[in-house]
Amino acid sequence: MESAAFKAARSPQDFLPLTPLSFLVLMVLADRDSHGYGIIKEVERRTDGSTRPGTGTLYTALQRLTDDDLIQEAEQRPDIGDDSRRRYYSLTALGRQTAQLEAERMANLVGLAIDSDLLPHTAGSSHGES
């Protein structure tokens, strides 16, 4: 078990690279608090169905993200009329910083892939223009 002092000293870089599912969860929670099923549906929507996390996989990721203080159980329920058994999650400040660093890391990798002609050229790119 980690001491509170060790956990408090952790920085966003300590969690990089994130797993794809962890990054997707943090992105969903960056927009709004959500419960597990809502996170699953939003991940499916954002990835056009290419990522469909199973409930066991998602809840394992949620537990790990909670243990790492990247997310927490939300203090308030966004929908008061919702099923009281649902646990809502929210992004912590550390979670937001970690997601931002991961996005920057991935953007740099995509830039390298474009430079290596591994991705189609994007509009406005200087590659291939005459």
Regions picked out by a protein language model, each given a short descriptive name:
Residues 1-14:
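Short, Lys/Arg-enriched N-terminal segment that forms or immediately precedes the first helix
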Residues 2, 94-130:
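Amphipathic alpha-helical dimerization/coiled-coil segments
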Residues 11-15, 75-78:
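Short beta-strand/turn micro-motifs at beta-sheet edges
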Residues 13-57:
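N-terminal helix-turn-helix DNA-binding core of bacterial DNA-binding proteins
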Residues 43, 62, 110-114:
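Amphipathic alpha-helical interface segments used for dimerization/assembly
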Residues 58-65:
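Basic amphipathic alpha-helical segments that dock to polyanions
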Residues 66-84, 90:
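Beta-hairpin "wing" of winged helix-turn-helix
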